[in-house]
Amino acid sequence: MLTDIALDAWGSDKAPEPEIKGAILACRHLPVRVHLVGQQDVLEPLLAQALRGARLPIEIVHASERIAMDEKAAQAVRTKRDSSMRVGLKLVREKKVAGFFTAGNTGAAMATAKMVLGALPGVDRPALALAVPTLTGPTILLDVGANTDCKAHNLEQFAVMGEMYARKVLKVDRPRVGILSVGEEEGKGNDLTREAFPLIKALPLNFIGNVEGRDIYNGHCDVIVCDGFVGNVALKTSEGILKLVREMLKISLKSTVTAQVGALLSRRAFDEFKRRLDPSEYGGTPLLGVRGVCIIGHGSSNDRAIMNGIRVAAEFATAGVNQQLEADFAAPADSHA
């Protein structure tokens, strides 16, 4: 049985080529049907050329407008009523597809999802949840940018949503949940983290207390909650460090003949290193807390990242994360498990 996923054809920086190629990859390797949302007269010949006569479960859904990366989110969402984002998310709302993926303007995607889908009952603020690669498997960090100012009960809700993500999608048994702070002791941190600590501690989760920045990457915690300001700074810092490490490795491995020979002998290990840290392998970041599956990818997404974004959307839909979250937030607090 195929899972129907809507794909924003006008999302990425180089759209629609990565989206078309990514849709084809997804349909060849995953049990999905892709609804490519964008200008039909532009997409039809490009899709036909890319398919080269192959028959795959891809269909085009017309949307006459595109939201550009540099557009102001609020204005674009308000004025572009037939944007590919809005049309794709309407398909989710109308249950014509199980999920939506875009590599477009993040602010516009979040605003459109909140407007078209709405928040789950009981959820005050949806959050962006990033799967961070570690030695032992992904760690979920949320929020990474949807809410720069938060209250303690927002972090409490992030903990519930992140734990559900880790348990249902990543198949982690009893995920360890922590609060990102400046020290491990209960009294450490700012007003926000100190107020959130007893709220999360009272939940029936596997709460391990405060964690520090290094714990994002060491695999000692499965779900780390923070406000969107701190989370986004951590995300952008990580991206910068990763780029630095890659460039330093390239320079070092070309510095001498001995280093070049060593690089050739270690090529398989370096390829595995690159694969594990490659953002395209992780596809996209789910917007947790809206009434439908919405996955947001990076603007630089290539065809493989698009395919993996479609995969993540299908996994979320199949796992029933939103249905479980809706049931959890509608139930008494002691039933969150």
Swiss-Prot record:
Superkingdom of source: Bacteria
Coiled-coil positions: none
This enzyme's EC code(s): 2.3.1.274
Disulfide bridge positions per record: none
Keywords, alphabetical: Cytoplasm, Lipid biosynthesis, Lipid metabolism, Phospholipid biosynthesis, Phospholipid metabolism, Transferase
GO biological process, one term: phospholipid biosynthetic process
Name of the protein described by the UniProt record: Phosphate acyltransferase
